[in-house]
């Protein structure tokens, strides 16, 4: 048996895979195994770790050299059928029948990555099989190219338009000020190099891509000697190599004519073709430059102005310097920018996506004539910080922040292994050792030693990266209403030029063939080629995280509920202190979101806000405000469950909270400071409050387009009940009107309101929740009674009942909602969002289980075909929510959102007559089960368990829901379709988020910002 961890085997091969190196990776408690196939050049790096969530990722170096978006269209198209899996979209079939915890495809400026992850052994290999066949043996037929990339469509009047999934997705990208700004800033830093090109594609360039160019791209880049396969998890290396050897190696050798061993197959470093190496070269500026561009005015509050410096290859010292200068609002550079009154939002840091990194210091919301003032401020601040030096408190807070970040595991975009993959690919892609970036903890320990022994260490970094760094790129982006006008004009010209050489008969033939291809419904026999996990092999018992309820003596002598979640948190504890806001008059609810944002940012105990933030950064990992809303189901099981502790008044409440996370070694200081924060909160600093208002407006405007679906969903459902109305008031379009009012009301008036709300919430009593590991709990639990006393937490008072009628006056433009069931949110955007909601069955019922299965089936079959494949939207979805008793449909980045509204209800009607094959239903149940078993990080498991408990959801109920899912039959699903269709005809609510130029009949809603 070949031992891949025996260093004596380095230089030996296993089934033609040469073992090049074995790396110890103590920072991740793992080993790294680097291999290269001697004949194909195929490289593998396996991080072997005791983690059942295994991940694979095929990576190809696909270097952008233009804005055609070829890599992006290829990423979509490879997943649309292959030799072994000749379906329309095996990716969709796979994702709808597998237990994946992550399944995606990602396009970067320099690479394309195809990752998948699962906690189930057989399911992992099923996904690996489909993906390997897709990337090496795709169909790439013409129909796929024009469906995913671009095509001309002709309406009934003969009018031409450009369509395509990628085309419409990227139109959404070009609708956002911030998206365009960051792309253009990178363009300024790396002119005529691959980062300066839009790897996703510019919609004005995408239609110029030919089918021949598309095929040549795959031939050029999708070769085994340009493929890097990243593996992670506990499945043995030998088993993975056996799989590849049995399923793919001989086929790859035959297709790519790999007869002999490749040159330099035993190279210790990654092999990169000369042609690709040339494409990867970065053209760095040799002297300072200035660039000004225009960007869409949607999402902008003024100009974006920045200064930028090249900083070289990746290293930890730049991360440390960035944390010192910009880590929080009180950090020296952040403070100077935020208090300058020259802009409303800071954008600073070391940007490390490429082989050459760069520091950027910038401000959003700058007035047109103030750009030189910003540059003067930045230069002045650099020299002042350098000359005065960095205070010890800023260094300590930076060290605390980085230590905390390196210890805490987070699940940002998929499993934590995705973050490790990114680190590996950054070095591997560029010809460096795969483990180069896998020593963050040990690298930072070296930095800390340098800080201790060299008092000028931080100062010298400022000199190195700023004072002595003479190439400076100054960049300005100006929002302009002409941006869309010019792009729309260019699009019209593009269509005219395409029309000149157009054979309309050939176009009609191509479109007829495409539509026929799209409308083909694959039979169970056809889809049976996709490997699946059998329903009978699944474990029907769910993980049961437990939050225990204890009581500690409150400030008033009462019993205060203490919720304790024991999880493996690696010496970190997470503490939540919640106070109900549901005893307030409804007119105050609208202020809760911003209040939760500012309560830890205004200062406390008569200290300035920056002094307070600096103090907390030296003690805690973070401290923040939040709000939590929800409701209790009225079903008997839930009411019985809550009966034991009902008199303690914590079930089904609406909460304002203050949370923190800290190292257990800092528990005493953390609890003391948190009690001080809660009891001495300040609401006096008008200047700071004004700055936070401007930041809020900037943030809301920046994410308006990206949040379009959220706004549409909340608007559509806002009259279904009190909780939905509250959600619209707190998070919907109505909240944007509240945000606008902060600029109209006096700052003192708003602060008085906030202070009143905060004090009233504290008077209403509170509860405490902690998530920590056993050792941490043993230390911290004995300290919590003193903390509760110091924080003056008292017995919870009962909630006041809130009705829908009481909330309606605080829903903006509510008078027209009941008269017109289509809510139309108008905003400058080149794509839109659609949302429809209708009634569904109640929590814990067998009917709700069948509706969940129906929704999942609809999402991956009918709606995927009609909304995405045929309609050209980037995506669509369906959800049956039994707690809310709603069925919801939606689309996003949709070229025709109003039409999608019709498709949803038509689709529901169509499937009422459908007979569902048993195999289809079982596959869908398997997919839904996959959603249940996605690994949850310990801190999140504790938070979820606590939230479930206070809203009356016990682990037993989750088990009942899963049992009900397992028992769903095809007839149950058919009955669900008929039931939901009948309910939708009696009541449905619709909303779309679309361009102002779209003419739709309904209640038109203007966005105030």
Residue ranges and their predicted role:
Residues 2-10, 233, 398-556, 560-565, ...:
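C-terminal regions of mature proteins
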Residues 45-52, 57-59, 167, 171-172, ...:
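His/Glu-based metal-binding/catalytic segments typifying zinc-dependent metallopeptidases
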Residues 7, 81, 139, 143-179, ...:
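Non-catalytic accessory/assembly modules
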Residues 81, 116-158, 162, 252, ...:
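M16/insulysin-pitrilysin zinc metalloprotease superfamily fold
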Residues 48-133, 175, 196-199, 327-343, ...:
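M16/MPP (pitrilysin/insulinase) zinc-metallopeptidase core fold and M16-derived inactive scaffolds
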Residues 303-393, 556-567, 573-648, 747-751, ...:
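Structured mid-domain segments that build the active-site/substrate or prosthetic-cofactor binding neighborhood
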Residues 2-55:
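Non-catalytic terminal extensions that flank enzyme cores
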């Amino acid at each position: 048996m070949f031992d891949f961890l025996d260093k004596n085997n380095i230089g030996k091969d296993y089934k033609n895979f040469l073992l090049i190196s074995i790396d110890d990776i103590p920072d991740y408690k793992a080993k790294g195994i680097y291999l290269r196939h001697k004949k194909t050049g195929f490289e593998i790096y396996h991080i072997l770790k005791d983690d059942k969530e295994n991940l694979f990722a095929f990576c190809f170096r696909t270097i952008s050299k233009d804005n055609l978006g070829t890599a992006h269209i290829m990423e979509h198209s490879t997943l649309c059928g292959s030799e072994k899996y000749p379906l329309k979209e095996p990716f969709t079939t796979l994702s709808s029948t597998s237990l994946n915890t992550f399944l995606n495809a990602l396009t970067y400026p320099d690479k394309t990555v195809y990752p998948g992850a699962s906690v189930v052994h057989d399911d992992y290999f099923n996904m690996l099989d489909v993906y390997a066949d897709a990337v090496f043996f795709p169909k790439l037929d013409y129909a796929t190219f024009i469906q995913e990339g671009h095509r001309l469509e002709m309406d009934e009047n003969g009018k031409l338009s450009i369509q395509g999934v990628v085309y419409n997705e990227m139109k959404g990208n070009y609708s956002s000020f911030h998206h365009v700004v960051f792309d253009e800033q990178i363009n300024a830093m790396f002119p005529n190099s691959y980062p300066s090109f839009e790897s996703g594609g510019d919609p004005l360039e995408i239609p110029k891509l030919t089918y021949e160019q598309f095929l040549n791209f795959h031939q050029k880049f999708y070769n085994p000697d340009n493929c890097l396969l990243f593996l992670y998890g506990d499945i043995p290396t030998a088993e993975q190599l056996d799989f590849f050897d049995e399923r793919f190696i001989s086929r790859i050798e035959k297709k790519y004519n790999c007869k002999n061993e490749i040159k330099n197959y035993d190279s210790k470093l990654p092999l990169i073709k000369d042609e690709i190496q040339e494409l990867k070269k970065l053209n760095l500026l040799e002297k300072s430059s200035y660039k000004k561009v225009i960007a869409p005015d949607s999402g902008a509050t003024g100009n974006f102005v920045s200064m930028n410096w090249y900083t070289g290859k990746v290293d930890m010292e730049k991360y440390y310097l960035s944390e010192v200068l910009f880590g929080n609002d009180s950090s020296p550079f952040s403070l100077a920018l935020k208090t300058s009154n020259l802009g409303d939002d800071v954008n600073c840091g070391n940007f490390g996506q490429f082989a050459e990194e760069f520091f950027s210091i910038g401000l959003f919301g700058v007035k047109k004539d103030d750009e030189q003032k910003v540059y003067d401020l930045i230069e002045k601040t650099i020299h002042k910080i350098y000359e005065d030096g960095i205070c010890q408190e800023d260094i300590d807070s930076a060290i605390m922040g980085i230590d905390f970040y390196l210890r805490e595991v987070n699940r940002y975009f998929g499993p934590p292994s995705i973050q490790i993959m990114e680190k590996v690919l950054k070095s591997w892609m560029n010809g460096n050792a795969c483990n180069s970036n896998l020593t963050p903890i040990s690298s930072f320990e070296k930095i800390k030693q340098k800080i201790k022994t060299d008092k000028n260490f931080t100062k010298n970094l400022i000199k190195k990266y700023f004072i002595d760094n003479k190439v400076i790129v100054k960049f300005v982006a100006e929002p302009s209403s002409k941006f869309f006008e010019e792009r729309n004009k260019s699009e019209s010209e593009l269509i005219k030029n395409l029309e000149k050489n157009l054979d309309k008969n050939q176009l009609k033939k191509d479109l007829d063939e495409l539509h026929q291809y799209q409308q083909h419904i694959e039979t169970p026999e056809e889809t049976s080629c996709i490997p699946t996990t059998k329903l009978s092999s699944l474990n029907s018992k769910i993980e049961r995280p437990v939050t225990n309820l204890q009581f500690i003596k409150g400030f008033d002598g009462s019993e205060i509920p203490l919720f304790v979640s024991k999880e493996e948190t690696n010496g970190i504890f997470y503490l939540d202190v919640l106070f109900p806001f549901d005893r307030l008059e409804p007119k105050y609810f609208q202020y809760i979101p911003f209040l939760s944002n500012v309560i830890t940012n205004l200062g406390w105990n008569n200290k300035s806000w920056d002094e307070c933030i600096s103090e907390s950064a030296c003690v805690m990992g973070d401290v923040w405000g939040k709000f939590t809303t929800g409701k209790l189901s009225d079903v008997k099981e839930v009411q019985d469950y809550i009966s034991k502790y009902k008199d303690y008044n914590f079930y089904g409440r609406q909460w304002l909270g203050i949370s923190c996370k800290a190292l257990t070694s800092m528990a005493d200081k953390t609890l003391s400071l948190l009690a001080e924060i809660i009891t001495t909160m300040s609401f006096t600093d008008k200047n700071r409050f004004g700055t936070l208002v401007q930041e809020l407006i900037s943030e809301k405007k920046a994410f308006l387009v990206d949040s379009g679906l959220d706004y549409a969903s909340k608007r559509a459902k806002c009259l279904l009940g009190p909780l939905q109305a509250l959600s619209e008031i707190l998070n919907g379009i109505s909240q944007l009107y509240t945000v606008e009012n902060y600029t109209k009301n006096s700052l003192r008036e708003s602060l008085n309101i906030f202070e009143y709300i905060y004090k009233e919430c504290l008077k209403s009593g509170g509860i405490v929740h902690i998530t920590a590991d056993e050792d941490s709990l043993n230390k911290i639990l004995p300290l919590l009674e003193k903390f509760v006393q110091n924080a003056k937490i008292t017995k919870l008072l009962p909630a006041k009942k809130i009705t829908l009628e009481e909330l309606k006056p605080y829903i903006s433009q509510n008078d027209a909602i009941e008269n017109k069931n289509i809510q139309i949110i108008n905003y400058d955007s080149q794509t839109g969002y659609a949302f429809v909601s209708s009634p569904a069955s109640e929590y814990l019922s067998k009917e709700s289980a069948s509706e969940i299965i129906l929704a999942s089936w609809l999402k991956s079959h009918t709606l995927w075909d009609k909304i995405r494949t045929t309609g050209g939207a980037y995506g669509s979805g369906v959800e049956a929510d039994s707690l809310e008793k709603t069925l919801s449909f939606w689309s996003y980045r949709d070229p025709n959102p109003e039409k999608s509204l019709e498709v949803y209800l038509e689709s529901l009607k169509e499937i009422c007559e459908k007979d569902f094959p048993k195999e289809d239903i079982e596959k869908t149940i398997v997919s839904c089960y996959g959603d249940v078993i996605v690994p949850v990080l310990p801190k999140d498991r504790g938070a979820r368990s606590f939230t479930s408990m206070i809203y009356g959801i016990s682990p037993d109920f989750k088990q009942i829901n899963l049992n009900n899912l397992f028992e769903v039959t095809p007839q149950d699903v058919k009955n669900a379709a008929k039931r939901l269709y009948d309910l939708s005809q009696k009541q449905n609510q619709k909303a779309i988020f679309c361009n102002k130029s779209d003419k739709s009949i309904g209640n038109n809603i203007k966005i105030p910002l």
